[in-house]
Structure formats: C-alpha cells, structure tokens
Amino acid sequence: MQFDLVLTGGDVIDPAAGLRGMMDIGIAGGKIAAVAPSLAGNPARKTIDAKGRLVMPGLVDIHAHVFVNAHDMGGRTDQICGCSGVTTLCDAGSAGSSNFAGLRHVLDTEVRTRVRAFVNLSAIGITGTSRGGELSHFPYADPEGCARTIVENPDLAIGVKLRFGPGLVWEYSAEPVKLARRTADMAGGVPMMMHITDSPIPLPALIEHMKPGDIVTHCYHGRAHGIMGQEKQFLLKEVVEAQRAGIIFDCAHGRNHFNFRMIERALDQGFLPDTISTDLTVTTATQGPVWDLPTTMSKLLHFGLPLEEIVRRSTAAPARIMGLEGTVGSLRPGANADISVFELREGAFELRDSDGDTIVAKRRLLAHLTMKDGRVCYERPEGT
C-alpha cells in the first residue's frame, strides 16, 4: 500500500502493544497503518529518518491545567505539549459546573492538542494558587451541577476532581470524599480524582471511600499523611491493598508534590505509579521544577524505573483511564498516528524536586519530533 508518511529506522518502544526494536512505521489517513522491521518496498509521499532515536506513542498527560486566562495556572496548551512529545492531556479540575462552558470554548477555539477534563466538585473550579480553596466554603460544592456537566459533555468530561488538603475543603473529614464519590456515581459511575498533598487526616481514612478506577494524585508528595504515613519510611498496608484493588496512583509532579526521597523509598519497596503526569501550570512549565512530562519521566528513570514501564505509564495507562484505549497511547495499526520521537541524551543533568532537593541524572529524555494525527507539529531545532 502507499503511505502518506513512513518513519524509518527508529527504536520503537510501546510495551502495551508488545513492540520493541528497530522498526518502520507507516502512516495513512492520520492513522497508524503498519509497523514492521522494514517498509522499504512500499511507496510513501514523505519519509522521516528516526535512526538513533526512541520512537514512542504520543505521550498522554493525565494531570495538567490548561484553562488559560481563567486563573493564574492555565498554560498555553499547544505550546506546552508540542515541544515535549505530548499529544493528549487531561485538565484536572480547573473548571467546575459554573465555568466549564468557558473551558470548552477555549479548547474548541484555541487548542489543537487532544484534551479531556475532570470537572471540579466546586462550582467555581480552581481559582488559582493564591486565592484560597475552591471548597473551603461548603455552598460552592455543586454535586448535581458537576454530575450534570459530565453527562452533558461526554466528549470532554471524564470524571470528578476533588482537592483535599489544608484550606481546600470545608471540613477535615471523609465527608468531602464521600460527596465526590456520590457525585461520580450520579454521573454514571465515572472516576474521581483526589489531590492528597498535606492531608489533614490519614490517607487510609480517605481512600477507603474510593472505588477501583478512582485516582489518588500526587502520590509521591513528601508532606503530611502520604502513602507512608507520618513516619515516611514504609508504605502503608492500606495503600498497597488499595492499589492491588484497582485504585490508581498518579504521581503528578507539580510545584509541591514530588519528593525524591519518597520516590526512592517507594520504588525500593516496589510501589510504582500507575500513571506519570505533571500537574503542569504556566509557572511550573516556565520556571520549573516540572518543565514538562519528559523531564518528570527522566527523574523516574534516574531512580531506576525501567524505561519500558515509564513509557507504559505515560501512554497506554492514562489513555485507558481517559477512555481512549486503542485510539491514542499506542502504535498498533488503526490507532491515531500520534507519535513522539525522543533522544535519550547522556550527560550530567541537574534536576530538582518540589522541595528543592537535586539529583544529577546521567540520562535525559528530550523530544526530537512530535506528530499528531499523522502531522508533524514540532521538530527540535538542530543543535539544541
């Protein structure tokens, strides 16, 4: 068959599809048409040489904030994503029932990146980094409106978002979690995502009200009541049991939620994140310490998480949670031709966590080319 484009000679890595090794990828009509050791016998309108590069599915970031101009967090989606190999992301509760239409307008008119969104339990959504908690005042909670928004926006809204932490909720008990879970049930049993950093109460008291498929985000924060309790030495048995039961643990780096000592201890004890994400905002994308998803992936690579598992947790795993399994996050024939090409650069790279600690990594992932629906949307300038 004739391809629109063939990506040749790259080191393909897609653990979910069982692909690893030097392969060519043929693209036609915006879809993956063929993956084989060689497609040299097939005509193509364009060929891109990927020799010496890693070729992965387009990255999927399940936790970011992209409601631009609505608060001080939202970043320019396409600018942030293209240069980092991300082709799909999920906005994690920036908007609630009262302003979700505004988020949709921004995405429909200004954004090419594929986006899904969690709807905040608070009607007003996240107001920013310095204006207090969106659920510190109980009347802002809008379970009926949140559920209705999810039901009325099936192409965009995928679940309920709750931020549980100091100053973020109206009371420090499990009641906000119970309300968020009931809201998710009202919306048809969609997942809820819960922010847990610096929780005022122990984590087991919260996760006991979650269901399989729900998401605990910021699982590697180093503050109060995390996955290792107050001693911060050993994983809580309730956390291990919750993950085994199907609760999703997402790392979501962010400004305050990614601690190297917690990561090292958790990985040493066999606790891997189910998904790798950024919690990216305009500030953390431009001033650090997050920068982008490949940087977060590189930090986990430094601590010994195998590259194949990093790719799985940054592509197929979040795609499945977002209801996009088989469409994105995969290089299987028939999937959208979302492809990221990376250089695994060697050197000495100083990387920082959310609490100011640094590591010197020997390897770092750098996006070389990003393709969405078969079209190149980013190429790294030569010599950079």
Segments the model singles out, each with a brief description of its role:
Residues G41-N42, T47-E110:
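Metal-associated gating/positioning segment near the N- to mid-region
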Residues S84-C90, S94-A95, E110-F138, K161-G165:
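Metal-cofactor-binding active-site regions of metalloenzymes
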Residues A70-I80, P139-I150, P200-L206:
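Short, acidic/polar
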Residues R261-E346:
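His/Asp/Glu-enriched, well-ordered alpha-helical/loop segment
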